[in-house]
């Protein structure tokens, strides 16, 4: 999977591509003129399929009959219908213009459940798919939406170009076809063209089907239990993931997509989070198990953290977060952010609500719905944005970088040491007024509560307006190691070192602690 933005399928190829009456003999003359496989689908969408009335050698009949699909029982032995043995231009109009139904016994015994085909990948965006096509002849079958209808697409790599061919259906018999031959099922269409190496569109044949990855899960592997929350596109559940018949199921968190009233573009945006998480593996980043895209509901399966979010812990009235734990959580967050930046991932929504804790007090960065891959990007878009956490260069010009994540990390430090207060909560400004105030420096976030001096210095360096002067995640980690003795990510190993730091601070209570130089 690639991390670039995914584009929804074109909505040009809809019902107009299907025959308009019970007749299923169609014109493919224009189709054979397509020379560039990269625009095959687009050209087909622009060419209306016409009904072809078979000419009679005698005097024209008063009321010509509309021909039906031609059905032949010995297609493999018939050279006149074998596109491998006869060039397209040498065929007579009658041969070229007919859509031929291939009976099931001519195809042979095939798998009739498309979910069981190893190269069927379920719902997938075009760009995401193209990242998997690398060699000539590679192909996969995926599901998309054309308008509001679900359709199958054959995506193939052919002579260093990617093509996406929509599988169409006839009006009355609902047969599947792409070029010349029609079948009762999509599985028969694929099996026949692959076995006989007959071009399924232009001169393209199906050579090497790309199998699904381990992270492409079947819906049957996931069991949904307690609902944990609800988001923009769906719900979050606690559930179980069955990875093997020999091992017990894993407790997971599952994001499910609402099944109704969502466009293809919204579904692609939902899966964008999984696209970013694919290559991530770090103790301070939420673990990604996989996605279920074979059928509804579409799901993202992730690690379940049984310790709630950092925001909930900070706001809890039952117990106050200790000074030791505050240091611990901020160190873990810095480690997670540094790992993301090393993978060229900009999170774009660092906040206490997106930091999860497990039972061992290990913090994990989560929620990659706004994340992008890259070192720096410029994006101007509306919608609901976390203005109170965003950097001034983002609010002013839509510019995102690793430095803008560090600015948000400063807001996280503020949340931790104010026991969960929202940044700029007391200034009384909201929305565009707050955005202008942050850009114009008329409001500045400060920590006025008791806080270790080195943490306060990190906070101040992270909130600098000049992105070049802002502290880096690597330097933040170094300071935590130097000042608090942190060298391991294991929570148990950290407690002793944190304790020794605070013991030293208490012994030097009356002395003014030195402020580290942050470079």
From Swiss-Prot:
Residues 209-490 form the Protein kinase domain. This is Spermatocyte protein spe-8. Keywords: ATP-binding, Cell membrane, Cytoplasm, Differentiation, Kinase, Membrane, Nucleotide-binding, SH2 domain, Spermatogenesis, Transferase, Tyrosine-protein kinase. Its EC number is 2.7.10.2. It is a peripheral membrane protein. Residues 1-39, 73-97 are annotated as: Disordered. The active site is at 349 (proton acceptor). One of its GO terms (cellular component) is cytoplasm. Residues 85-97 have a biased composition (Basic and acidic residues). One of its GO terms (molecular function) is ATP binding. The gene is spe-8. Pfam families: PK_Tyr_Ser-Thr (PF07714), SH2 (PF00017).
């Amino acid at each position: 999977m690639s991390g670039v933005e995914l584009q929804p399928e074109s909505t040009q190829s809809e019902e107009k591509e299907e025959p308009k009456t019970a007749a299923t003999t169609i014109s493919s003359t224009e189709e054979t003129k397509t020379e560039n496989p990269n625009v095959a689908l687009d050209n087909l969408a622009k060419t209306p399929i016409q009904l072809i009335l078979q000419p009679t050698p005698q005097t024209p009949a008063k009321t010509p009959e509309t021909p039906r699909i031609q059905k032949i029982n010995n297609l493999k032995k018939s050279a006149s219908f074998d596109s491998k043995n006869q060039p397209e231009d040498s065929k007579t109009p009658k041969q070229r213009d007919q859509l031929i139904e291939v009976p099931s016994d001519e195809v042979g015994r095939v798998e009739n459940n498309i979910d069981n085909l190893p190269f069927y990948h379920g719902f997938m965006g075009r760009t995401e798919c193209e990242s998997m096509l690398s060699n000539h002849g590679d192909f996969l079958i995926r599901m998309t939406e054309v308008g509001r209808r679900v359709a199958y697409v054959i995506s193939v790599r052919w002579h260093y170009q990617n093509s996406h061919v929509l599988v169409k259906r006839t009006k009355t018999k609902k047969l599947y076809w792409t070029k010349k031959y029609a079948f009762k099922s999509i599985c028969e269409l694929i099996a026949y063209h692959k076995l006989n190496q007959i071009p399924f569109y232009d001169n393209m044949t199906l050579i090497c089907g790309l199998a699904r990855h381990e992270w492409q899960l079947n819906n049957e592997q996931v069991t949904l239990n307690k609902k944990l929350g609800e988001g923009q596109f769906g719900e979050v559940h606690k559930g179980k993931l069955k990875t093997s018949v020999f091992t017990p199921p894993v407790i997971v968190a599952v994001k499910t997509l609402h099944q109704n009233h969502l466009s293809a573009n919204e579904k692609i945006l939902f899966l964008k989070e999984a696209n970013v998480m694919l290559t991530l593996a770090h103790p301070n980043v939420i673990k990604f198990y996989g996605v279920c895209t074979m059928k509804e509901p579409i799901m993202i399966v992730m690690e379940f953290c049984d310790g709630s979010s950092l925001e909930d812990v900070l706001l809890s009235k039952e117990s106050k977060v200790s000074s030791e734990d505050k240091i611990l959580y901020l160190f873990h967050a810095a480690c997670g952010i540094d790992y993301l930046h090393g993978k060229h991932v900009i999170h774009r929504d660092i906040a206490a609500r997106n930091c999860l804790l497990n039972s061992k007090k290990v913090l994990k960065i989560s929620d990659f719905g706004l994340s992008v891959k890259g070192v720096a990007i410029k994006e101007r878009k509306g919608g609901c944005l976390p203005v109170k956490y965003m950097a001034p260069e983002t609010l002013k010009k839509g510019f995102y970088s690793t430095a803008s994540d560090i600015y948000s990390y400063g807001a996280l430090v503020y949340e931790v040491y104010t026991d969960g207060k929202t940044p700029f909560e007391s200034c009384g400004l909201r929305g565009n007024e707050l955005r202008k105030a942050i850009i114009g420096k008329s409001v500045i976030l400060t920590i006025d509560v008791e806080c270790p001096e080195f943490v306060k210095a990190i906070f101040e360096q992270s909130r600098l307006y000049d992105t070049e002067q802002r502290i880096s995640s690597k330097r933040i980690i170094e300071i935590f190691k130097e000042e608090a003795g942190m060298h391991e990510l294991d929570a148990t190993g950290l407690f002793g070192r944190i304790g020794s730091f605070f013991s030293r601070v208490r012994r030097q209570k009356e002395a003014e602690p030195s402020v580290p130089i942050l470079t």
